UniProtKB/Swiss-Prot annotation:
Keywords: ATP-binding, Coenzyme A biosynthesis, Cytoplasm, Kinase, Nucleotide-binding, Transferase. It comes from the Bacteria. GO terms for molecular function: ATP binding; pantothenate kinase activity. ATP binds at residues 90-97. It comes from Limosilactobacillus fermentum (strain NBRC 3956 / LMG 18251) (Lactobacillus fermentum). This is Pantothenate kinase. One of its GO terms (biological process) is coenzyme A biosynthetic process. Its EC number is 2.7.1.33. It is an enzyme of class 2 (transferase).
Length: 307
């Protein structure tokens, strides 16, 4: 069975033609500030790919608001703010964090009267101490390493319109959850949830994170390219962030570079690649939009799920 049977496929030029605006709302300096370390994104990417996507999301959001209003009227209930939730999924190092941050900024520029918030699910990993207690430290990043009950409670509280909801944050420099530095979400109109696991279907819960999504995006690339970007990022970090003595990977930056890369390649082989193949990639066709990348993070195709 063709896995793309439920999708319309567009090349870059065709996708751009749906909203051919030359207004980017951003400068290249803005993009450089939000992109991940080795990601590549340009103003042309914004014009060709992201502005049409943002316009589509705006249309979906307006329809969502209208439907919520009609539903509340039909049920004779007082209206309340129910946030529109967008999920961003994809492998490590594929550029999903850049996509999430870019969508947040563009939505703020397009709808300045709306509160646009973003979280990452990294904060819902179990702390290292708990992973060690459970004997799954080597499985960090796999589905069982996430506190799904806590994540689902967070999503439910946001969806219920709680005045403020807190989410744990994660520090890549210390390689652990930062329980004492929570992120507070204040009744967003739109919430972007970014993470490798947001479209997964865990076997131990009846409710899934994706059940809360009104729209979802999967950032896609061939595994060989993702590995290349992963190792490129690791090399850049060896020369920058890893030079900080407080960084988790500081010993690798001070030791033999070949040994450091040997370790990184082993982590990719033992953790990230199996996680991609077994748990992340199978969720791709659950997304509403798939952004397909080629060399240099160039998006050459966009897949849009048919209604």
């Amino acid at each position: 069975m063709d896995e793309w049977i439920n999708y319309d496929q567009f090349d870059r030029q065709t996708w751009h033609s749906f909203f051919p605006s030359e207004i980017t709302f951003l400068t290249q300096e803005n993009l450089d500030e939000i992109k991940s370390l080795n990601d590549q994104i340009s103003l042309r990417d914004v014009q060709d790919i992201y502005l049409p996507l943002i316009k589509l999301i705006q249309l979906q959001y307006q329809n969502y608001q209208q439907m919520q209003l009609q539903k509340m009227t039909f049920l004779r209930k007082s209206s309340r703010r129910i946030p529109y939730i967008i999920g961003i999924a994809g492998s490590v190092a594929v550029g999903k964090s850049t996509t999430a941050r870019l969508l947040q900024i563009l939505l703020k520029r397009l709808m300045p009267d709306r509160r646009i918030e973003m979280i990452t699910t990294d904060g819902f990993l179990y702390p290292n101490a708990e992973l060690k207690r459970r004997g799954i430290m080597a499985r960090k990043g796999f589905p069982e390493s996430y506190d799904m009950d806590r994540l689902l409670t967070f999503m439910n509280d946001v969806n219920a319109g709680e005045d403020q909801v807190t989410a744990p944050t994660y520090s890549h420099s210390v390689y652990d959850v930062m329980e004492d530095h929570p992120q507070t979400i204040y009744k967003p109109d739109i919430l972007i949830v970014e993470g490798i696991n947001v479209l997964q279907l865990p076997t131990t819960q009846r409710l899934f994170v994706s059940d809360f999504f009104d729209f979802s995006v999967y950032v896609d690339a061939d595994a060989s390219l993702v590995e290349k970007w992963y190792l490129e990022r690791f090399g850049m970090l060896l020369d920058t962030a890893f030079q900080d003595p407080t960084n988790y990977y500081y010993p690798y930056a001070q030791g033999d570079r070949a040994e450091a890369f040997k370790m990184a390649k082993q982590v990719w082989k033992d953790v990230d690649l199996p996680n991609l193949n077994d748990y992340i990639l199978p969720t791709r066709t659950r997304a509403d939009v798939i952004l397909h990348k080629t060399e240099h993070h160039y998006i050459d195709r966009v897949y849009l799920r048919e209604d």
